[in-house]
A protein has these predicted regions:
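Cyclic nucleotide-binding regulatory module and flanking cytosolic helices
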Residues: 1-49, 93-94, 99-100
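Cyclic nucleotide-binding regulatory domains
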Residues: 25, 36, 51-113
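Short aromatic/basic micro-patch
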Residues: 44, 63, 87, 118, ...
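Well-ordered beta-strand positions
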Residues: 46, 64-65, 109, 221, ...
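Cyclic-nucleotide recognition modules
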Residues: 86-151
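Phosphate-/nucleic-acid-contacting segments
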Residues: 174-252
Length: 252
C-alpha cells in the first residue's frame, strides 16, 4: 500500500526530500539521476486556483512537475467554447508538447492552489544525451498520456452520458488512489459540474441529471468537495472501463 501524499503543499528545496517519492507510487531512481534532476530543476512556483499556467499558442520555455494541487489541460474555440483534455494530478509532468510545437498546443489552468517544480525546456537535450534512462522515462510518460487521450476519445465518440460520467469518476478515483490520496473510499474532488461537462462534451443540464441518476442508484456521493464511490464494480461495468494505473510511474 502506498503511503499518503505529502502533508505540505510546498515543493521541498531539495529533490531528495520530495514527499511524492516517499509515497511508493513512483519508480525508484538512481542517486546520480536524482542529482541531475535537482540540477536540472530551475526552481519552484505556486499558482492560485483559477490561474493560467500555460497559455494556448504562447510558449514560455518551461516544463513543470505538479507537486500538489489539481489543474487541467484545455483547448478553446474561437467562440469561447472549451474542451478539457485531461485533469492533472500530483506527479504529472506538464508542458512537453510545447517542445515539439510552435508554442503550447493547449492551455493549463489551476483548479486549486498548486505547487510546481520548474524545469527549463532547453535542458531536455542534455537529459536525453547524458541520461538515457530519464529520457526513456519521459517517453514513457508521453506514451501513457497518449493512452489516456485514446480513452477520452473513445469516451467522447462512443460512450453515452451515463457511461462517460461513470468512466470519469472511476478514472480520477483510480489515479488518486494510486498516489495515496484516497482515504476510506473518499477522495478530494474540487472539480465542479462545468468542469465535468467540458471534459465529457456534455451540456451542464445533462451532466447534472447524469450525476443525480448515478447517485440515486447508490453508486457515488459528492459532499463538500469530496467524492466517495460506493460501488466501483458497478461503475466499471456501466462505463466498460477497467483500466488500472500502473503501481509505479516515473517522476521528474
Amino acid at each position: 500500500m502506498n503511503n499518503s501524499v505529502p502533508t505540505t503543499a510546498i515543493c521541498p528545496p531539495a529533490c531528495r526530500a520530495c514527499g511524492l517519492r516517499k509515497t511508493g507510487a513512483f519508480s525508484p531512481i538512481a542517486v546520480e539521476e536524482l542529482d541531475f534532476i535537482e540540477a536540472f530543476r530551475s526552481g519552484t512556483t505556486t499558482a492560485s486556483a483559477g490561474a493560467t499556467l500555460l497559455h494556448e499558442q504562447k510558449p514560455n520555455g518551461k516544463l513543470f512537475t505538479l507537486y500538489a494541487g489539481w489543474a487541467f489541460r484545455y483547448k478553446t474555440m474561437s467562440d469561447g467554447r472549451r474542451q478539457i483534455l485531461n485533469f492533472l494530478l500530483p506527479g504529472d509532468f506538464i508542458g512537453l508538447q510545447q517542445k515539439f510545437a510552435d508554442g503550447s498546443m493547449h492551455g493549463i489552468e489551476a483548479i486549486t492552489d498548486c505547487s510546481l517544480c520548474v524545469f527549463p525546456r532547453e535542458g531536455l537535450w542534455e537529459l536525453y544525451r547524458n541520461h538515457p534512462s530519464l529520457g526513456y522515462d519521459i517517453t514513457w510518460l508521453a506514451a501513457r498520456e497518449e493512452g489516456i487521450v485514446d480513452d477520452h476519445l473513445l469516451t467522447a465518440g462512443r460512450r453515452n452520458a451515463t457511461e462517460r460520467v461513470a468512466m470519469l469518476l472511476m478514472h480520477l478515483y483510480r489515479r488518486l488512489d494510486r498516489v495515496g490520496m484516497a482515504e476510506n473510499g473518499w477522495i478530494d474532488f474540487p472539480i465542479n459540474q462545468q468542469h465535468i461537462a467540458d471534459a465529457l462534451g456534455l451540456s451542464l443540464v445533462h451532466t447534472n441529471k447524469t450525476l443525480r441518476r448515478l447517485r440515486q442508484l447508490g453508486l457515488h456521493e459528492i459532499e463538500d468537495g469530496r467524492l466517495r464511490l460506493l460501488n466501483t464494480r458497478a461503475l466499471e461495468r456501466i462505463a466498460d472501463y477497467y483500466d488500472t494505473p500502473p503501481a509505479q510511474v516515473p517522476l521528474l
